[in-house]
Regions:
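Short, motif-level signal for alpha-helix interfacial/capping segments enriched in acidic residues
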Residues: 2-12, 50-53, 76-91
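Functionally important transmembrane alpha-helices
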Residues: 63-74, 78-126
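Membrane-interface helix/loop boundary segments of multi-pass membrane proteins
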Residues: 28-64, 93-98
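Active-site alpha-helix of zinc metalloproteases
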Residues: 21, 25-26, 34-35, 69, ...
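Membrane-embedded glycan transfer/ligation machinery
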Residues: 2, 21, 34, 38, ...
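Hydrophobic transmembrane alpha-helices of Major Facilitator Superfamily
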Residues: 14-23, 27, 31, 81-89, ...
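Juxtamembrane helix-loop-helix connectors linking adjacent transmembrane helices
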Residues: 1-25, 43-50, 119, 124-126
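Residue-level signature of transmembrane alpha-helical entry/exit and packing/kink sites
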Residues: 13-18, 54-65, 80, 84
Length: 126
C-alpha cells in the first residue's frame, strides 16, 4: 500500500523519510483533522449520548473529519482508502472520548507499522 514511496528511499533519505511518515505526518494530520476540523464540529456539551457513547453530532463530526482525512490519501487503492476511513473513525472516537494525544499515539503506531512492513518487503540493496 505504500508503493507510492518506491524510488523515494535512498540510504541518505531513509531516516528522514521514516521520521516524516511516522512522526511528522501523524502529528500534523491529527492536529488538522481531529484537532481543528473535528473540534470545530463538536457540540459544546456532550449530552444525549447514543451510539457507542457518541451523540449524533459527534458521529456527524467524526464522519465529516474522516471523509476529509480519507480524501487526502488518494494515492491508495479503494481498499486502502476504506481501511484509512475506518482508522480515521477510530482516531476520531479516541479523540472524542480520550483526547487528542491518544489519537496521535494511535496514528503514530499505525504509520510505524505500515512503514515497518514496507521496509521489510523492500529489496535489501538500498
Amino acid at each position: 500500500p505504500m508503493d507510492f514511496m518506491n524510488g523515494m528511499i535512498t540510504p541518505d533519505s531513509l531516516v528522514l523519510l521514516v521520521f516524516a511518515v511516522v512522526v511528522v505526518a501523524p502529528l500534523y494530520e491529527e492536529l488538522i483533522f481531529r484537532g481543528v476540523i473535528l473540534g470545530a464540529w463538536l457540540p459544546p456539551d456532550r449530552t444525549n449520548k447514543k451510539l457507542l457513547g457518541l451523540s449524533p453530532n459527534e458521529l456527524k463530526a467524526s464522519l465529516i473529519s474522516s471523509i476529509l482525512f480519507t480524501l487526502i490519501h488518494l494515492q491508495y487503492d479503494m481498499l486502502g482508502m476504506a481501511v484509512i476511513f475506518g482508522l480515521s473513525l477510530i482516531f476520531s472516537y479516541a479523540r472524542i472520548r480520550h483526547g487528542l494525544l491518544l489519537a496521535m499515539i494511535l496514528h503514530f503506531i499505525n504509520n510505524a507499522c505500515a512503514m515497518l512492513m514496507y521496509l521489510l518487503q523492500m529489496p535489501t540493496a538500498l
